[in-house]
Amino acid sequence: LIQLVLYFFLFILLLFGLIGSLYYQTSSGTIRQQTERTTRNSIDQSSQFITSYLKKLKQTTTVLSKDQAVRQFAQDRSADQETVQHLMRTMIETDPDLVSAVLVTKDGRLVATDTKISMQTSSDMMNESWYQEAIKERAMPVLTPARKESLTSEKEKWVVSITQEVVDQTGQNLGVVRLDIGYDSLQAYLDHLQLGKQGF
């Protein structure tokens, strides 16, 4: 009788162990699938946001590069920069993610919304990669890698830029416009999505 009770007790233990193991495997698989699904959704959301955000910025840059006042200033050395600067300042004020705007003309004139950038020489800017890439892409908007920019409001700030060549009616180069976006704006949104915090 004691052996029978012992066998029965062992059988119950094995049964509980088997059920527990199956439950653990099932639960673990479900949790893993849920986590992977959440991570994929976060990646998709991030990708869609960045794509639509950059599309909007590229459209803004295109509008600026084709603006009549910008073209006229770039063509005419005697033209007043006030109209162009007012236009660029308005763009900066209406989009909190934009930190500065710059126009460098082919003949070496510089208009910028930030006074610290205004103190730089246009010849130095013409030698920088963002200027050269804009020329190379023939009036198409170009996204530049993140870099540090010295601004009046901050000692240094990480920015991502959209640049575009300014051309006349015949497609001849007149200069390059650049819009600087605070990198922390993109980073803050991606952090808000909590990508990776629930992933593997």
Where does each model-flagged region fall?
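Structured catalytic/translocation cores of nucleotide/phosphate-coupled proteins
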Residues: 19-24, 31, 35-36, 105, ...
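Glycine-centered, small-residue-biased loops immediately flanking beta-strands
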Residues: 199
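Extracytoplasmic/periplasmic sensory segments of membrane signal-transduction proteins
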Residues: 37-47, 52-140
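Extreme N-terminal signal-anchor transmembrane helix of membrane signaling/transducer proteins, especially
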Residues: 1-29, 33
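Extracytoplasmic/periplasmic ligand-binding sensor regions of membrane-associated signaling proteins
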Residues: 94-97, 106-192
